[in-house]
């Protein structure tokens, strides 16, 4: 799993970001992520999954800092939103500002960042 994770980041930094930079005519060095949490449940977060997520977050922060431009989680269940309210208190304000957790009311927020014709 982690080899694919690192491969993805290395591909972003060494190939995709430079290609996007050339095409846009300006520096592109971060990504915009939309995560649909429709099928997420609290039982999905086993201790093994939590451990892997923690390790991934640590490695990402150490080796690929500031690569997150924005992340919007849509259809987040209440339990996830409640946990986020606690967790974000332990994170840097700059990081928190890049993450939006939304329930089924996500469309207005999403359209603040993405043109409607670019969404499925």
Regions found by a protein language model. Give the residues of each.
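Basic, amphipathic alpha-helical/coil surface patches used to engage anionic, phosphate-bearing ligands
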Residues: 1-120
């Amino acid at each position: 799993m982690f080899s694919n994770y690192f491969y993805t980041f290395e591909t972003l930094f060494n190939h995709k970001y430079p290609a996007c930079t050339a095409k846009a005519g300006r520096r592109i060095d971060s990504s915009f992520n939309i995560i649909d949490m429709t099928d997420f449940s609290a039982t999905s977060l086993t201790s093994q999954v939590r451990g892997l997520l923690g390790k991934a977050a640590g490695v990402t922060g150490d080796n690929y800092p500031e690569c997150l431009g924005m992340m919007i989680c849509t259809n987040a269940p209440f339990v996830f939103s409640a946990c986020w309210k606690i967790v974000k208190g332990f994170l840097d304000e700059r990081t928190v500002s890049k993450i939006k957790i939304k329930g089924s009311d996500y469309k207005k927020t999403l359209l603040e960042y993405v043109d409607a014709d670019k969404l499925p």
